[in-house]
Amino acid sequence: GTCPGCDLMEMWALHVDWANPGNSNLTALPGIQLTDWDQTLCGSGSDWSCMSQPGTSQKLDPIREPLHYPLQYRNFGTHETLVGCFAEDVDGLDRAAVHWFELRDTGAGWSLFQEGVYAPDEYNRWMGSIAMDDSGNIALGYSVASSALYPSIRYTGRLAADPPGLMPQGEASLIEGSGSQLTTSSRWGDYSMMAVDPLDGCTFWYTQEYANSQGNWQTRI
């Protein structure tokens, strides 16, 4: 987050020889440069909780450093894809946004096909999960909260023909939270999951956390 030009995806290729495990190998691939991002949400140190909630000084942990859920893979024959996302500080003031990306391999190795940062307003968005269906359409789900918005579940998306780097299909609410998390742990999510139904290849399923009026976390599919 403090080294311009240093933000990249590191990738490895794993070859497994089940008949002769000694022939298996793990090979580092060339790094893939992404647009520079600031991952220093909540500063440094042991307390990384800074996602505000209404009516309490207790804040939520944005899980700032890892990818939010494993990358999801598809093989379209002409190309392979990997989609993923993580949280970043979008304004330098600890406002969390979802940084998403799509990698492609058309036969010459993996490269960045598109990326974007979803931050349409002043709310924090984090703990995302992203998936692509059989037609190349993408759905992105995430947590959303602020000092004026209880922790809730929302989603957005893009069609395969939409302009690259954008989520222009608008934001929708799956469920609005009715309280703030008041338990002793500030951990939140760990993690959410967006998946495509294998029966039809186009129905997205999403599971995520939100807070109820009793100050307890709940999950919803």
PLM region descriptions:
Residues G1-I221:
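C-terminal PAP-associated
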